[in-house]
Amino acid sequence: MSTDTDSELDLYIGAVLGKKAENVVVLDMAELTSIADVFIICSGKSNRQVNAIAEHIQVVLKKHKIKPLSVEGTKEGHWVLLDYGHVIIHVFYQAMRDFYDLDGLWVDAGRIMTPALKKLQAEEKAPEENDDM
């Protein structure tokens, strides 16, 4: 992935992380499907958090003049899909994510690691390292 693409994806990822989405995975779908170039998959701990994450994503991206083509699933809050054309964001309640297992379904997709995700991983690792002391 190019630096331009990474910075664009970091905009989406930053929006996803704004309401503490968990288990964020970015899949390179370009070679596997014509639906989208990238899937961003994340989880929330409750249907209320799932909806808050989805709403926050829309607010943040709208400030950058990026609007979804379609939004589905907000009524139930179990699986919200935000279609931004080349990027599709799946926000799951964790039990639904486990059930549908998109991560496993698209196991052949490459994982994309952007600067924002690298920073997130480092922050998640830091408390674990302190626990070892």
Question: What are the functions of these language-model segments?
Answer:
Residues 41-43:
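Short hydrophobic/aromatic beta-strand micro-patches
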Residues 49-66, 81:
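Compact, glycine-rich, soluble single-domain proteins
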Residues 1-26, 30, 48, 52, ...:
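Long, contiguous binding/interaction regions
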